[in-house]
Amino acid sequence: MSDAARPLDPDEAARRLGPWLGAGGQAGGVVLAVSGGPDSTALMGCAAALPPRVPVLVATVDHGLRPESGEEAAGVAALAGRLGLPHRILTWRGEKPRTRLQEAARAARYDLLLGLAREAGAGAILTAHTLDDQAETVLMRLCAGSGPAGLAGIAPARRLGGLLLGRPFLDLPKARLVATCAAAGWPFAVDPGNAAARFARARLRRVMPLLAAEGLTPARLARLAARLRRNEAALAAAAEAARPSLAAAPAGPGRLALDAAGLAALPEAVALRVLADAIAALRAGERRPERLERLEEALFGRILPAIAAGTPLRLTLGGALLDLAGGRLLLAPEPPRRRTKRAG
Ligand SMILES: Nc1ncnc2c1ncn2[C@@H]1O[C@H](COP(=O)(O)OP(=O)(O)OP(=O)(O)O)[C@@H](O)[C@H]1O
């Protein structure tokens, strides 16, 4: 059997899940997010086989978006019962948006899982994201023009609402999880959305074999994500360390000021990060971060050349008004747009 499609053996499963679920794992136990697909079914099966372990609660979110979703959730409940694990179905109620439905479904899913984990006193939520998910995410973000932060992909572990969100299978090929289910006789569902060409992820999945033939394998894309995650941490630290040397006279409440010469003296990647962070701090929570490509155009195409030439500059970027004058780059929230008066 090829290594890429070998079922997980109990030792390997224990090594991966032990830190989360083992005797010394998460105090209060964990919630397993199980959709009923092969990846999360394998997560549930492997967790059930792990002795001894902290309390485990399995949760399936029924988004109510496909006619068969209720049946799938019931299928997970049945298998959880067979495996001796408690199971809950969480239903996404309320208005479903017409646009960005997948994004809204994901946000609702994490909210529901978090609510359950808090109610159960669990310390962590585990999902079954795989190396294939990671590779697809990186590819999708590459297509969308993401920078290092986006290309760092799915985090192996991160904080979520005061709890931990873990992905213990993130470096495992999906084929191994499918093989694990098959070998153990755990039934799983196949999401038709996975093949629907109207979703970008599904379209990219079809391109994957072509890219792999050229050397851009899922494993390589996943390694790129891990590498960029390390670089991203270094960049964040460098931007943080540069901040004191950039402090310029405060520009009034709700405003920021950066020393222009100091900004220009930084390595370009650090300067870009400082600018992005400053705009994000100014517009906290009010809008989505500006596209990296626009930030790059503004910084490298206009702001740094103006600093070098000593010329003043005004521009709006990411909801902020930037004003370069007197050796300072002032940032203020962009004023509400005025209607242009129609002549005559
Ligand atoms: N309906 C669901 N109920 C419970 N868990 C789910 C559900 N859908 C997905 N998950 C969890 O999320 C993991 C990833 O699923 P999938 O790739 O379909 O979601 P995604 O939308 O890409 O998720 P993410 O936004 O977290 O990347 C699954 O392995 C599972 O652990």
UniProtKB/Swiss-Prot annotation:
A GO CC term attached to the entry: cytoplasm
InterPro entries: Rossmann-like_a/b/a_fold, TilS/TtcA_N, tRNA_Ile_lys_synt, tRNA_Ile_lys_synt_N
Keyword Hydrolase included in the entry's annotation: no
Pfam families recorded: ATP_bind_3
GO molecular function, one term: tRNA(Ile)-lysidine synthase activity
Source organism of this protein record: Methylobacterium sp. (strain 4-46)
Main location: cytoplasm
Reactions catalysed, as given in the entry: cytidine(34) in tRNA(Ile2) + L-lysine + ATP = lysidine(34) in tRNA(Ile2) + AMP + diphosphate + H(+)
Protein name (database record): tRNA(Ile)-lysidine synthase
Keywords assigned by UniProt, alphabetized: ATP-binding, Cytoplasm, Ligase, Nucleotide-binding, tRNA processing
Domain remark from Swiss-Prot or TrEMBL: The N-terminal region contains the highly conserved SGGXDS motif, predicted to be a P-loop motif involved in ATP binding.
Domain of life of the source: Bacteria
Family: Belongs to the tRNA(Ile)-lysidine synthase family.
Cellular compartments annotated: Cytoplasm
